[in-house]
From Swiss-Prot:
<dbReference type="GO" id="GO:0008270">
    <property type="term" value="F:zinc ion binding"/>
</dbReference>
<dbReference type="InterPro" id="IPR036409">
    <property type="entry name" value="Aldolase_II/adducin_N_sf"/>
</dbReference>
<dbReference type="GO" id="GO:0046570">
    <property type="term" value="F:methylthioribulose 1-phosphate dehydratase activity"/>
</dbReference>
<feature type="binding site">
    <location>
        <position position="109"/>
    </location>
    <ligand>
        <name>Zn(2+)</name>
    </ligand>
</feature>
<dbReference type="Pfam" id="PF00596">
    <property type="entry name" value="Aldolase_II"/>
</dbReference>
<comment type="pathway">
    <text>Amino-acid biosynthesis; L-methionine biosynthesis via salvage pathway; L-methionine from S-methyl-5-thio-alpha-D-ribose 1-phosphate: step 2/6.</text>
</comment>
<dbReference type="GO" id="GO:0005737">
    <property type="term" value="C:cytoplasm"/>
</dbReference>
<keyword id="KW-0862">Zinc</keyword>
<comment type="similarity">
    <text>Belongs to the aldolase class II family. MtnB subfamily.</text>
</comment>
<dbReference type="GO" id="GO:0019509">
    <property type="term" value="P:L-methionine salvage from methylthioadenosine"/>
</dbReference>
<comment type="function">
    <text>Catalyzes the dehydration of methylthioribulose-1-phosphate (MTRu-1-P) into 2,3-diketo-5-methylthiopentyl-1-phosphate (DK-MTP-1-P).</text>
</comment>
<feature type="binding site">
    <location>
        <position position="193"/>
    </location>
    <ligand>
        <name>Zn(2+)</name>
    </ligand>
</feature>
<feature type="binding site">
    <location>
        <position position="111"/>
    </location>
    <ligand>
        <name>Zn(2+)</name>
    </ligand>
</feature>
<dbReference type="InterPro" id="IPR027514">
    <property type="entry name" value="Salvage_MtnB_euk"/>
</dbReference>
<feature type="active site" description="Proton donor/acceptor">
    <location>
        <position position="132"/>
    </location>
</feature>
<feature type="binding site">
    <location>
        <position position="91"/>
    </location>
    <ligand>
        <name>substrate</name>
    </ligand>
</feature>
<dbReference type="InterPro" id="IPR001303">
    <property type="entry name" value="Aldolase_II/adducin_N"/>
</dbReference>
Amino acid sequence: MDAAAQTSLVVSEDRRHPANVICALCRLFYANNWVTGTGGGISIKHPATGHIYIAPSGVQKEQIEPEDLFVLDGVDGAYLRAPAGHRPSACTPLFLACYRARGAGAVIHTHSQHAVLCTLLFDDVFRIANIEQIKALPSGRRDAAGKPLSLSFFDTLEIPIIDNTAHEEDLAPGLEAALARHPACTAVLVRRHGIYVWGPTADRAKVYNEAIDYLLELAVHMHRLGVPPDCPIGEEKRFLRR
């Protein structure tokens, strides 16, 4: 593929094009303090071509432009575009694992402080229940017509936690094992590191990431009060620290 063809993969006036969405989300996530210091990453699969777009490693997320992005073939994972002067994302093996195992349309990786704190408070699985925001997340269940169902207010959200490794790419086996153990989960926490969140589209992945971060932050506050995040309704005062 010549230079012009490679450039055409990432240059588009369509604001919904994956290259433009990645740049916009990187700026938003930086403003939310989720991807500071070049940390974190994001990938989106083009709904029409199946090409996989990935933000590079080592680039300040709020400064990323479409020309900075890597593009992979969605079938064999071969690089269709590798911009000079940039390193492929160390998250790439994990993004690909989510695409394979979950049929995801987008994957988000942040270094949210709320995510890191919750990995210190829970062992193998983060749990929170009976909170309205849970309803923004998928349950893994479907109705009689096959339509995906969201979690209900009375459901418990469970997110598996895996241990961190010295190198990002070495997280892939642990993430794949967590996906197999928790077939309904839409996120995996990485201890002392951050979180991976995915969804069927970039819009859904964004919503899931925002909802989960809200719940993680709430869980930290509940823990400070002595209230378990999965506390049954009506028993909160029994746990409150005086």
